[in-house]
Amino acid sequence: MQDLKRQKLPLRLIGSMQRVIVALAALAPLVLSPAHAEDKEVTIAYQQIVDPWVVAIANGSIEKATSYKINWRQFESGAKVATAMASGDVKVGVIGSSPLTAAVSQGLDLQLFWILDNINQAEAMVVRNASNVSKPADLKGKTIGVPFVSTTHYHTMFALQHWGIDPKDVKILNMQPNQIVAAWERGDIDAAYVWNPALAELKKSGHVLVTSGDLSKLGKPTFDGIAVDRKWGEEHKDFMAKLVKAIADADDQYRRNPSQWSATSPQAAAITKMIGGTAADVPESLSLYAYPTLAEQASPQWLGGGSSSRAAAALKDTSAFLKEQKRISELAPDYSKFVTPAYAEAAMKLK
């Protein structure tokens, strides 16, 4: 038998082996690194809500700020966003306070990390002018369209309770905003509780009976927020901080000069391209919301302060009402764990 130690390898084979070793060395960082390229991709859910951050989605500034590939998916309601997040398809999503409360009460481990807007006058119950409804009592026997498990659904049920109207005395239909507009035009519904751009369409042939701002003053505030899958967020803290900073910058641009966001502005065009509606309605729609600053977000006024934060208190109060209405069966022992100021605080340190 030949002595293998003395056997010479052909030069061609040696060259091939060297190329393989070089290739493996180049691949090693990708295999071993916890944040390789395929990890820098995320799916984010947004809704048909008129907000400054929609412009940041449209112009790509969020991708630029985070260096992530972002798959943007549009949903018509927070309940649908919650379902997508429960499936794992979506890691970050826009969700109202009511569907968020329902989701975490049912075991979904989400964290609210940004208040997209304080709803104020931006959601309202509108009644058809032809429905002969001039006061709340006139709603008896009427049909109301509303997206179930949404902030407007929550306020619809609270409004009926406040007015002393038994929900059995009205017909409440589960409809998404686009369906509400179509049903309104057909005359199938007498009233609806919804947000823009659908709300703007209904106002053209209807009048406002009550707004979310009115009901918030009675102790039932609502807001639109952005939530993240807790585990995913904790594993991508750098992305989360940069995402929050990009959203805050978009809000700041609007706050500094709202007059630049006119019906003929590039911003209005970008918003309507992303979520529909008409550019003429954008300026008024934006003015109906309040957009908390980055400092306000991190404070107890919204996300900071643990159980004493405004957001945690709102979730707790909403959960009690949802249970009373039999929309959820159990209450979480502590709603503050579903609220975090950490990413807002980190964003404040970025330039």
Report residues per predicted region:
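Bacterial N-terminal signal peptides that target proteins for export
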Residues: 3-22
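Cleavable N-terminal signal peptides
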Residues: 23-25, 35
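Sec/Tat signal peptide C-region and signal peptidase I cleavage site
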Residues: 31-37
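Short, glycine-/small- and polar/acidic-enriched structural segments
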Residues: 38-174, 179, 190-196, 212-213, ...
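Structured segments of extracytoplasmic/periplasmic soluble domains
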Residues: 65, 84, 106, 142, ...
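Secondary-structure end/capping motifs
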Residues: 234-327
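Conserved C-terminal helix/tail region of periplasmic/extracytoplasmic solute-binding proteins
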Residues: 311-351
